[in-house]
Amino acid sequence: MALSVEEKAQIVNEYKQAEGDTGSPEVQVALLTANINKLQGHFKANGKDHHSRRGLIRMVNQRRKLLDYLKGKDTTRYSALIGRLGLRR
């Protein structure tokens, strides 16, 4: 259920801060959000897949940590990112 190479490249191009940027918090959060959304669809069809649910919870926690970091560093970038991604924080 991982993202394809094309999907990752599209997300990186959309959220990058500079050319060649793949590690900024915005890119990482956007990739995690796409993976989380894809896994949520998987759980609608496979409700008893507890092994994958653990991975989902890990991704959600990692995204939360990155968002907390970004909020502490630059609140304007944080606000813009959650607005673009449609997160409810």
From Swiss-Prot:
PROSITE patterns documented for this protein: RIBOSOMAL_S15
> Pfam families attached here?
Ribosomal_S15 (PF00312)
Q: Which SMART domains match?
A: Ribosomal_S15
* One term under GO cellular component: cytosolic small ribosomal subunit
- Spans through the membrane: none
Q: Which GO terms describe its molecular function?
A: rRNA binding; structural constituent of ribosome
Q: Which domain of life is it from?
A: Bacteria
List UniProt keywords, sorted A-Z: Ribonucleoprotein, Ribosomal protein, RNA-binding, rRNA-binding
Swiss-Prot/TrEMBL GO biological process terms: translation
Q: Name the family.
A: Belongs to the universal ribosomal protein uS15 family.
**Role this protein plays:** One of the primary rRNA binding proteins, it binds directly to 16S rRNA where it helps nucleate assembly of the platform of the 30S subunit by binding and bridging several RNA helices of the 16S rRNA. Forms an intersubunit bridge (bridge B4) with the 23S rRNA of the 50S subunit in the ribosome.
The record describes its quaternary structure and partners as: Part of the 30S ribosomal subunit. Forms a bridge to the 50S subunit in the 70S ribosome, contacting the 23S rRNA.
Q: What is this protein called?
A: Small ribosomal subunit protein uS15
Source taxonomy lineage?
Bacteria, Pseudomonadati, Pseudomonadota, Gammaproteobacteria, Pseudomonadales
